[in-house]
């Protein structure tokens, strides 16, 4: 759903998604955030989601309302204090060859994400209630 408000750059989990190529409907590109000078590269949409979810887990924001079950005994990871190394303005300067999206996941409830995504080239902000809705937004805008 198209909204009229914009994403705050100053949320701890602000992510800039730069889409560099689209091959057979598969998106690939880079992810930028304030806690790393180097981008994280993804080759497909699943990697994009895994990298982002791992980032939210390390940041512990937004906190997930459910934990994934596993049959493998997990070691409890200690809380890692992340330090900002880039300003939000620096993160926002990066652009993708095919498209750029600012992502703000506000909640992680019902084993999914809820939040807003801003398509920079189209100057449109969308609200999404699930990862599936987010993927549909990215797909409809780019493919």
Regions found by a protein language model. Give the residues of each.
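Short aromatic-glycine-(Arg/Gly/Cys) micro-motifs in beta-strand/loop hairpins
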Residues: 20-36, 106-122
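Mixed-charge, glycine-accented linear interaction segment located at domain edges/termini
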Residues: 36-40, 50-57, 116-143
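Intrinsic disorder/low-complexity detector
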Residues: 1-17, 23-25, 52-111, 143
């Amino acid at each position: 759903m198209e909204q009229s408000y914009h994403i705050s750059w100053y949320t701890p989990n602000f992510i800039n998604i730069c889409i560099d190529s689209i091959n057979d409907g598969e998106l690939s590109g880079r992810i930028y955030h304030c806690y790393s000078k180097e981008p994280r590269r993804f080759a497909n949409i699943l990697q994009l989601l895994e990298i982002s979810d791992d980032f939210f887990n390390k940041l512990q924001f937004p906190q997930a309302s459910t934990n994934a079950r596993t049959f493998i005994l997990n070691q409890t990871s200690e809380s890692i204090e992340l330090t900002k190394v880039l300003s939000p303005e620096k993160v926002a300067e990066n652009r993708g060859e095919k498209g750029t999206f600012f992502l703000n996941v506000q909640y992680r409830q019902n084993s999914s994400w809820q939040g807003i995504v801003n398509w920079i080239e189209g100057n449109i902000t969308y609200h999404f209630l699930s990862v599936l809705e987010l993927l549909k937004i990215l797909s409809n805008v780019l493919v």
